[in-house]
C-alpha cells in the first residue's frame, strides 16, 4: 500500500493537523502579498509589532515585577494582537473566497467594507501597540534612573 501524503503510515491522521496546514497558509499569504498590497502590509505590520514586543517587553518581564501599568499594557497588547489576527484572517478568507468566485465564474465584489474596516482597525491598533511599547520602555528607563539617583543620594548621605 503506497504512503499517502499528510497521513501516518498506519493510515491515521497526524496528531497535530495544524502543522500540515502551515505550507498552504504560507502559499496563500505569498499570493496575497503578490497580488493584494493591503493584506500583505497588514501581515508585515503584525510581524514587525510582534518582533518589537518580544524584543522590548520580554526582558522587562524578567527584570521588573509587574505593576498596574504593565498589566494594563499587557492586556492592551493582547487585545491588539487579537484584532490584528482577526483582521488578517478575515482578509485572507475574503481573498480566498474572491479567488474561488473568480475560479468558478461568479462575480466577486472585491474587498468588502468589513474587511477594509478591520484592516484599518488593525493599523490603528498596531499604532497604539507601538506607542504603548515606547511609553513602557520610557517609563522603565525613567524609573531605573530615578532609583539609581536615589541610591546615589543615599550613599552620599551615608558617607557624609
UniProtKB/Swiss-Prot annotation:
The keyword Amino-acid biosynthesis does not apply. Residues 1-33, 90-119 are extracellular. The keyword Transmembrane applies. Its main location: membrane. One of its GO terms (cellular component) is membrane. Disulfide bonds: none annotated. It is found in: Membrane. It is a multi-pass membrane protein. The chain crosses the membrane at residues 34-54, 69-89, 120-140. Residues 55-68, 141-160 are cytoplasmic. Keywords: Membrane, Transmembrane, Transmembrane helix. Partially overlaps CYC8. This is Putative uncharacterized membrane protein YBR113W. It comes from Saccharomyces cerevisiae (strain ATCC 204508 / S288c).
Amino acid at each position: 500500500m503506497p504512503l499517502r501524503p499528510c497521513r501516518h503510515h498506519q493510515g491515521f491522521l497526524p496528531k497535530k493537523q495544524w502543522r500540515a496546514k502551515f505550507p498552504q497558509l504560507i502559499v496563500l499569504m505569498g499570493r496575497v502579498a503578490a497580488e493584494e498590497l493591503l493584506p500583505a502590509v497588514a501581515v508585515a505590520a503584525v510581524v514587525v509589532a510582534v518582533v518589537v514586543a518580544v524584543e522590548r517587553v520580554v526582558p522587562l518581564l524578567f527584570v521588573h515585577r509587574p505593576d498596574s501599568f504593565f498589566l494594563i499594557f499587557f492586556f492592551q497588547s493582547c487585545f491588539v494582537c487579537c484584532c490584528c489576527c482577526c483582521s488578517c484572517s478575515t482578509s485572507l478568507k475574503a481573498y480566498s473566497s474572491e479567488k474561488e468566485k473568480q475560479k468558478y465564474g461568479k462575480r466577486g465584489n472585491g474587498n468588502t467594507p468589513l474587511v477594509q474596516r478591520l484592516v484599518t482597525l488593525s493599523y490603528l491598533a498596531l499604532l497604539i501597540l507601538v506607542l504603548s511599547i515606547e511609553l513602557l520602555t520610557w517609563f522603565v528607563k525613567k524609573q531605573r534612573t530615578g532609583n539609581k539617583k536615589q541610591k546615589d543620594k543615599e550613599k552620599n548621605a551615608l558617607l557624609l
